[in-house]
Amino acid sequence: MLLNLLPIAFLLMTVLILLIVSRTQAQVGTLWLVFTGGALLCFGTITAIRWLQPAMITIEGWAMVGTNPIDLVFGFDDITWVFAFALATLLLGAAFTLAIRLDLVQRPQEWVIELSFIVAGLLPIMAQNLMSLVVAWTILDFFELLIHVSGYTPEKINRQAVMAFAVRMGGSWLLIAARSEEHTS
């Protein structure tokens, strides 16, 4: 069951290791090895998931609508696995091609952002029902807001990012309200 979360766990561990090692003034090659190792572990576990077919992860009773509980279900099936495999392959391709550009100025913070987006992108791929998709997509929107507000962009774009996030949250809440109205009818 928790095998489904292993690629996400490997990527989150890679993010933490990159953040810690980058503070120690390590060489770029060391940081690249950490990044590539995390990408390889993610790729390997997603490949293994195809053959192991772990059970879905269900968070029962996540929200109550009247007397009806709404469950969140995450996992891989024959269709979603393909998208997760494609995402892991893109990450691995980016990691391997970074080796060519190591002599250029590298910013490990950008690698952390890439890994964070892959983690946040795997959750919507794993969603097996509408409410799971809404929750996962909201998490992805939150990651995007954090990156825009963290100082990588000018203040004008920060305001635009906050407004876009507010509109997305409004859309998510409208979808949740419509879904809850459907359950009560």
Feature annotation, model-predicted:
Residues 10, 76, 128:
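Single, functionally critical "micro-switch" positions that shape active/binding sites
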Residues 1-6, 14-112:
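Transmembrane helix-loop-helix hairpins at membrane boundaries of multipass inner-membrane proteins
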Residues 9-16, 89, 119, 123, ...:
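Generic alpha-helical transmembrane segments of integral inner-membrane proteins
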Residues 24-26, 112-116, 120-181, 185:
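Alpha-helical multi-pass transmembrane bundles of energy-transducing inner-membrane proteins
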